[in-house]
Amino acid sequence: MNRYKFNDIENRLGVYFNNPSLIKTALTHSSFGNQFKDAKYNERLEFLGDSVLQLCITEYLFNKFKDKSEGELTKIRSLIVCENSLYEIAKKLSLGEYIRMSKGEELTGGRERMSIQADAVEAVIAAVYLDKGIGFVNDFILLHFEEMINKAINNEIVLDFKTKLQELLQKDGEILIQYELVKYEGPPHRRKFFTNVIINEKVMGIGEGYSKKEAEQNAAKEALKRLEKNYE
């Protein structure tokens, strides 16, 4: 990671590292370590960051919601720390553009892959913890996860838009939902798919993604935005 990129990611995170190698390792995918044998990669940091994130979110929810049961708190926490939520945090911070990975991984769409970006968030959290301590990383997590925490508390995080769309429409009885692949573009190793969701022969949402599944989920998400107003 060159000096410009290092300064840029520090500014994005709002963290200035005493040990720069920590953030460098946090943003190094295992494929890069396989290609360059001396390079450290982020899997161990990811392991630590997962526990740090769980602890900070758990303590926050425990102190904030004294009237909620263990089951309710567990459900809220699971929404905040799930892969989808971590991916949203990664996109907000543009982490994907800073992750070091092998050329092969990048050519197969690794830079946009949800799991790689979500894992990088956990590794970054570990890097901040090791460099700055628990108090600092707790503030860091609450700052960057604030929107996600509020969404989870208000039950606004949806993990499966297709299922939610189907459940919403079941209120009106038998309704036909179809997903139609409209087109795809790009080379085989980085192909983007475009899908319509058709409800009773009417296009209600258009989605795109780097897999057919992702495109269908995004189409369902758009349809939900249009339809939920009718059920409020």
From Swiss-Prot:
Cofactor(s) it depends on: Mg(2+)
PANTHER family in UniProt: RIBONUCLEASE 3, RIBONUCLEASE III
Family, similarity comment: Belongs to the ribonuclease III family.
Organism name: Clostridium botulinum (strain Eklund 17B / Type B)
Principal subcellular localisation of the protein: cytoplasm
EC number annotated for this UniProt entry: 3.1.26.3
Catalysis performed (reactions): Endonucleolytic cleavage to 5'-phosphomonoester
The protein's name: Ribonuclease 3
Known function: Digests double-stranded RNA. Involved in the processing of primary rRNA transcript to yield the immediate precursors to the large and small rRNAs (23S and 16S). Processes some mRNAs, and tRNAs when they are encoded in the rRNA operon. Processes pre-crRNA and tracrRNA of type II CRISPR loci if present in the organism.
Keywords: Cytoplasm, Endonuclease, Hydrolase, Magnesium, Metal-binding, mRNA processing, Nuclease, RNA-binding, rRNA processing, rRNA-binding, tRNA processing
GO molecular function: double-stranded RNA binding; metal ion binding; ribonuclease III activity; rRNA binding
Active-site residues per Swiss-Prot or TrEMBL entry: D50, E122
Alphabetized PROSITE patterns for the sequence: DS_RBD, RNASE_3_1, RNASE_3_2
Lineage of origin: Bacteria, Bacillati, Bacillota, Clostridia, Eubacteriales
Residue stretches making up the DRBM domain: 160-229
Cellular compartments per GO CC: cytoplasm
Domain RNase III: 6-133
Chain positions recorded as Mg(2+) binding sites: E46, D119, E122
